[in-house]
């Protein structure tokens, strides 16, 4: 799951807003509804796993939460002769599931049910070329983020074994 597939801009204009503001930290789509409810003065629904981004919008020093991403295979059949990607890459995307955490500090951990797990420092390696997952220097980071992904899976009743 690469940045190009997950980076989606969200534009919002608030009543009384006189200046533009850009938040470059990753945020999650599941936070949009709680943010809109917060702006309307309504309570967040108990079934919404997301949190309001209003503190982040109003305060430039507020740190965003970790962002969790899920990829579940699309088991549809890809037409033979497709040139979207090499056959091996298409087969991998169709058959594997991934759970990803992107931290506010710029780290990204991808855990998979099949294939290789990955860790990237997006600040130093924005194109995700150097997988640091097996680097002993980053083992505590991998452990901490793995625990957070498992906690997220528990919260969202995600039964995928990683």
Question: Where are the predicted features?
Answer:
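Non-transmembrane alpha-helical segments in soluble domains
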Residues: 33-37, 41, 54, 120, ...
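Short, solvent-exposed polar/charged micro-motifs at secondary-structure junctions
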Residues: 55-59, 76-81, 154
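C-terminal, low-complexity/hydrophilic appendages and adjacent surface loops
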Residues: 3, 69-134, 162
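Substrate-binding rim/cap in mid-to-C-terminal beta-strand-loop elements of soluble/periplasmic
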Residues: 1-47, 51-63, 70, 102
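Internal amphipathic alpha-helical segments of the cytochrome P450 catalytic fold
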Residues: 29, 33, 116-119, 129, ...
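Long, internal low-complexity/basic segments
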Residues: 132-162
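Generic structural signal for small/hydrophobic residues in well-ordered secondary structure
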Residues: 9, 32, 53, 109-112, ...
């Amino acid at each position: 799951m690469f940045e190009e597939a997950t980076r989606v801009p969200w534009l919002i204009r608030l009543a009384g807003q006189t200046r533009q503001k850009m938040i470059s930290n990753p945020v999650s789509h599941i936070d949009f509804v709680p943010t809109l409810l917060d702006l309307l003065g309504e309570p967040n629904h108990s079934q919404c796993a997301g949190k309001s981004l209003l503190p982040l919008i109003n305060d430039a020093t507020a740190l965003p939460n970790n962002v969790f991403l899920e990829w579940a295979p699309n088991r549809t059949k890809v037409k033979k002769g497709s040139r979207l990607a090499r056959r091996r890459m298409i087969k991998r995307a169709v058959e594997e599931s991934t759970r990803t955490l992107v931290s506010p500090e710029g780290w990204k951990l991808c855990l998979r049910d099949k294939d290789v797990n990955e860790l990237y420092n997006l600040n130093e390696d924005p194109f995700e070329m150097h997988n640091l997952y097996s680097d002993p220097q980053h083992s505590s980071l991998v452990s901490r983020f793995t625990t957070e992904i498992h906690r997220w899976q528990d919260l969202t009743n995600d039964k995928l074994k990683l």
